[in-house]
Regions:
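Sec-dependent N-terminal signal peptides
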Residues: 4-14
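Small beta-barrel nucleic-acid-binding modules, primarily SNase/OB-fold domains
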Residues: 17-133
Length: 133
């Protein structure tokens, strides 16, 4: 009986440590589709928006702040009027792209630092957002 217990524990240990063993691993989706009408809530800046992400627990997926990887934008909160004007135009263009999109997809999600938000590659109608912008 002791021998059976020892080998059972040894088997569980080896399977859990093995890179081949997938008994305890869970897979997660690598793409998330959003609807511009129902999921996108608001646009915060020229590269940041808030959306409800489906297939994620509501604690993490509802009203999630998403920053688009690769888009550099000016800050609206600046004293330089030309920079603020440029930031407003970037926000307006980004907002319109999201509103007019028929298909929005998030890929390569990465948790942001210093806050509850994520970085993502955002695809609009099959094209990565950086190429459209």
């Amino acid at each position: 009986m002791r021998r059976f217990g020892f080998f059972s524990i040894l088997f569980i240990f080896l399977v859990s440590c093995s890179s081949e063993g997938k008994f305890f691993r869970q897979s997660y989706p690598d793409k998330f589709k959003l609807s511009a009408e129902t999921d996108v809530m608001e646009t915060l800046s020229g590269n940041t928006f808030v959306a409800n992400v489906k297939n994620i627990h509501p604690v993490f997926g509802e009203a999630l702040t998403i920053k688009v990887r690769g888009l550099k934008v000016d800050s609206i909160e600046t004293e330089d009027s030309s920079s603020a004007s440029r930031a407003f135009r970037q926000w307006h263009k980004f907002s319109n792209l999201l509103k007019e999109a028929s298909d929005i997809e998030l890929r390569n999600l990465e948790r942001g630092r210093n806050g509850f938000w994520i970085w993502a590659d955002v695809y609009i109608d099959g094209e990565i957002l950086g190429d459209l912008y």
